[in-house]
Amino acid sequence: MFYLKGEKEQILLIKHANSGHWSFPKGHVEAGETEIQTAVREIREETGVNALIDTRFREVVTYSPKKDVIKDVVYFFATTEDYETSNQEEEVSDIKWMDMDKVLPSVSYKNDKELVKKAINFYKNHREEFENDYYNNT
């Protein structure tokens, strides 16, 4: 989740209540939902932020939380006009916006750090579109 206004180029991180690691909003697809609908819902539920999803950036992170269990998590590039957050206390113990160039040390897992690098590269490669208010003109 990116907040891109003027000089502010920030990424939203959440601290997961069950594990204490810093990462991104995520969750399970509900019956009848698309991946995009799931992403928008989970971001809103966990952070109180309304997201605009950019489907040009879609990354799948595969990991194994325990033996014989493999999970795929789909991430999209998302932006928001909302800077105020509110955390879903049962799942999220803290939320913070971080400057894009300072976020990597705060991200807990290697896979997530790689995801951040890819998302930042995507943003930099499309910066002019974002600066020209791409989403409000499409």
Residues covered by each model-derived region:
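Class I (Rossmann-like) S-adenosyl-L-methionine-dependent methyltransferase catalytic domain
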Residues: Y3-K5, V60, S64, I70, ...
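Charged/polar positions on well-ordered alpha helices
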Residues: M1-F2, R41, P105, N121
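A contiguous, well-structured "functional interface" segment within a domain
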Residues: M1-K8, T79, Y134-T138
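Charged phosphate-binding loop/patch that engages nucleotide di/tri-phosphates or the phosphate backbone
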Residues: P105, N111-T138
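Short acidic/polar alpha-helix capping motifs at helix-coil junctions
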Residues: L4-E7, P25-K26, E46-G48, D68, ...
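Unchanged
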Residues: V29-L115
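Phenylalanine-focused residue identity feature
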Residues: F2, F24, F57, F76-F77, ...
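N-terminal strand-loop-strand
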Residues: M1-F24
